[in-house]
Amino acid sequence: MANRKSLIKPTLLRSFYVSVVFFCLFVFIGSVTPAAGADNETIPSYGRGPHEVLIFSDYFCPPCRALEPKLEPVLDALYKQGNVRIRFVDTPMHRETPLFAKFYLYAAKAAPDYRSAMRARQVLFALAGKENVFWMDERVEEAFRKEKVAFTPFDFRTVQPELNGMIRKHRVDSTPTCVILSPGKKALKYTGADGILKGLGSLQ
C-alpha cells in the first residue's frame, strides 16, 4: 500500500510534502492548450444511486495496479445495479501522478460515461507499469491516440480545489483507499485490496 510516510519518513514533514505534491498539480498542467469554456469543472461521477463510492488511487502505486483488475468487475456490478455513484479521485503519491490525473480528466471530459472512464483508467494503469519512461504530455497523448481514447484538454487547475479538498476531508494518506458515503450514515473508509473489496461487497 503506497503511503506518504514511505516518501518522507518524518511525520512532521508530511504536511509540507503534501503541499509540495499538490503544487505539482499546477506544474504538470503541461503543453496542451486548454479548451475554452472550462470554468466549472468537477471530478466526474458515474451512476445515480444513493451510495457515493470514492476510489482514491495512484496509477504508479503497485498495490493499486494489482487491485484494479479485481476492482473493475465489482464496480461494474454496482454500477449496473444502479445504487451507487462512483468517483475516481487520483491521489498523488508519486511525482508522475498529476500528469496522469490530468489526462484521466481530459478523457472524462471528452467521453463522460462510465465505460469510457474505465477504459481511460486501464490505459493509464498500463502506461504507469512501464519502466524507465520519462512521462510527458506528448507521450501520454500518443498512447491515448494509439488506444483510441478520446480526450479534451481543459484547465486542470479548475478541478484542483475539489481534488485537494476530498483528499484532505477523508484524510487519505495511502492508496488504494475507498470511502463509501451513504445517506444518514457515517462515512466508511477502507484501505488495501481486501478491505476495499469487502467494503464494496456490502453494497451488493
Ranges and model annotations:
Residues 1-14:
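N-terminal secretory signal peptides that target proteins for export/translocation
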Residues 34-38:
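Boundary at the C-terminal end of the N-terminal hydrophobic targeting segment
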Residues 43-44:
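Non-catalytic pre-domain segments flanking phosphatase-related domains
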Residues 47-60:
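Short active-site neighborhood of thiol/selenol oxidoreductases, capturing the structured segment around
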Residues 56, 68, 140-204:
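C-terminal cap of thioredoxin/glutaredoxin-like
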